[in-house]
């Protein structure tokens, strides 16, 4: 026999359960970028590269052969060369890389932009090097945060970037008995506020040039093609960003090119390659170009040395005449508006 149950008076105003009191704890926001050596010498670069290249998200095959290559060859040869590259862009005043300087500034400006929400605390960290994600989480908890929004500073998702930030953030939680609640912002590769900020930054930069570029190259960080073949959505998100940027700027695929930079090792990476494309453009008679790096939230070694330095030299050595790299969004007003909107959207329900 089925019993009839009345819900008419189950939650009348007189016997309704009281709403839980609003939390008086603070909410943390942790901006996270890739990382940087602590010093611009071979020793500092070696420590950084060992941590970076030992991450299974970055180099998926961490077998014996890779360990021999990494410890026997790469860490004995590459640090000296990369140290010179870092020295060429190093912030000597603060004795740190530009990436660290800019990420700190982004954190400070975002904190100021959220000043009317006094219970929100903003800090920053690096996936590799210092300050670490663990230090960031510990610091926010020490300031009374029981909820933390982790913000990977990568517009386009990749397992080698965004996912490893998540891995490390949640690994840190495994060491804690009293854990904060964690959220992670999603990729924002197709958000209107991001595309608009990119477009404005390009338009404003072009106004400062004494020439009109014949075309613009949009250069994204590369990755092994094998990773995409296995299901990483990174390439399709780079394509989506580029197509939206073309639409916003009124350019087609002959005027705004999509390329991939920073390949490493001997396997096939995503193509077309930035350096090969720029070399061919110059050899084909293109004299004036600009390069934008939409996937980088802050200028770093890959933008300041690889693009503004190496690729500029490649272009001019092969017949090009005018080359300019559009600064990343950094802590500019448009760049900070991207972070402000992203964070406020993802903090809904916590504020």
UniProtKB/Swiss-Prot annotation:
One of its GO terms (biological process) is heme biosynthetic process. SUPFAM superfamilies: Chelatase (SSF53800). It holds the Pfam family Ferrochelatase. It comes from Bradyrhizobium sp. (strain BTAi1 / ATCC BAA-1182). GO terms for cellular component: cytoplasm. Catalyzes the ferrous insertion into protoporphyrin IX. It comes from the Bacteria. This is Ferrochelatase.
């Amino acid at each position: 026999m089925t019993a009839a149950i009345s819900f008419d008076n189950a939650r009348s105003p007189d016997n309704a359960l009281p709403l839980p009191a609003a939390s008086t704890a603070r909410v943390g926001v942790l901006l996270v970028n890739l990382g940087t050596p602590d010093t611009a010498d071979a020793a500092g670069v070696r420590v950084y590269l060992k941590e970076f290249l030992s991450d299974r998200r970055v180099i998926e095959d961490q077998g014996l052969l890779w360990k021999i290559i990494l410890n026997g060859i790469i860490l004995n040869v590459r640090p000296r060369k990369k140290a010179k590259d870092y020295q060429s862009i190093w912030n000597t005043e603060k004795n740190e890389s530009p990436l660290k300087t800019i990420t700190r500034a982004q954190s400070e400006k975002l904190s100021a932009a959220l000043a009317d929400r006094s219970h929100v605390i903003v800090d920053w960290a690096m996936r590799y090097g210092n300050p670490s994600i663990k230090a960031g989480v510990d610091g926010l908890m020490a300031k009374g945060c029981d909820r933390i929004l982790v913000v990977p500073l990568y517009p386009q998702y990749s397992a080698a970037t965004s996912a490893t930030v998540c891995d490390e953030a949640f690994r840190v939680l495994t060491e804690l008995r009293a854990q904060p609640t964690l959220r992670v912002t999603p990729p924002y590769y197709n958000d209107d506020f991001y595309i608009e900020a990119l477009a404005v930054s390009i338009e404003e930069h072009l106004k400062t040039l004494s020439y009109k570029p014949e075309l613009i190259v949009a250069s994204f960080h590369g990755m092994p093609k094998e990773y995409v073949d296995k299901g990483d959505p990174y390439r399709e998100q780079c394509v989506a960003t580029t197509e939206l940027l073309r639409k916003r700027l009124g350019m087609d695929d002959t005027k705004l090119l999509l390329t991939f930079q920073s390949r490493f090792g001997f396997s096939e990476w995503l193509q077309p390659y930035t350096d090969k494309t720029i070399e061919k453009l110059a050899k084909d008679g293109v004299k004036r170009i600009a390069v934008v790096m939409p996937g980088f939230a802050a200028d770093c070694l890959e933008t300041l040395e690889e693009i503004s330095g190496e690729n500029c030299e490649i272009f001019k050595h092969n017949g090009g005449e005018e080359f300019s790299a559009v600064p990343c969004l950094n802590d500019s007003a448009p760049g900070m508006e991207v972070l402000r909107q992203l964070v406020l959207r993802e903090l809904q329900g916590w504020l």
